[in-house]
């Protein structure tokens, strides 16, 4: 359980600058420039890395379980990460957990209004076509009260299930997966069963 009583063992930082060329797109070269911070956390005899990459126009984070003698394999049974958003934030979103299709027209509402009921009343009736909790898929784009726009999305899904965003009220929006609202990837019905540590990327 890495949700409490964690200790910071070390913090390191570095910078990176390179270019890469996309196969398609408007730009020939894309500048890949960021500052990186690695925070090594520990609890009892276990360790976990929290990695941040800060770009000029965004921030990325991920958790990583480094190679260690106490862990051969592990199961992830819940995800506790959250984005603490303002109740004043408005969002373009589509509903998660539709079993017939993935793509919809977007709803535009407050973060706290994300629900199958709201979507059915204002965009398209999905009451016949949905499972699980009220949640939104990513990409999830916000319009802040100050006029700024923020998008939340996922990347680099290796041995991990995709993310959904579920409102908790007062703007708090936890990351999925949550409990039995995802299709189990592990043989024991766990949410995610990675094969083992993969390095800190």
Show where each model-derived region lies:
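N-terminal accessory beta-strand-rich subdomains and adjacent acidic, glycine-rich linkers
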Residues: 1-201
């Amino acid at each position: 359980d890495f949700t409490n009583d964690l200790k910071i063992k070390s913090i390191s930082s570095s910078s990176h600058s390179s270019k890469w060329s996309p196969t398609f797109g408007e730009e020939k070269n894309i500048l890949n420039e960021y500052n990186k911070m690695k925070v090594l956390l520990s609890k009892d005899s276990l360790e976990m890395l929290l990695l941040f990459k800060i770009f000029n126009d965004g921030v990325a984070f991920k958790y990583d379980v480094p190679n260690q003698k106490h862990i051969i394999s592990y199961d992830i049974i819940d995800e506790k990460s959250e984005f603490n958003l303002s109740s004043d934030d408005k969002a373009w979103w589509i509903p998660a957990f539709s079993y017939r299709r993935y793509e919809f027209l977007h709803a535009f509402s407050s973060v706290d209004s994300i629900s199958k009921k709201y979507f059915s009343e204002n965009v398209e009736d999905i009451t016949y076509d949905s499972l699980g909790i009220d949640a939104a898929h990513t990409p999830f784009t916000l319009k802040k009260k100050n006029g700024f726009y923020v998008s939340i999305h996922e990347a680099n899904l290796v041995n991990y299930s995709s993310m959904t965003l579920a409102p908790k009220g007062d703007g708090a929006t936890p990351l999925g997966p949550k409990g039995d609202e995802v299709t189990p990837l592990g043989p024991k019905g766990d949410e995610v069963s990675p094969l083992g540590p993969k390095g800190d990327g």
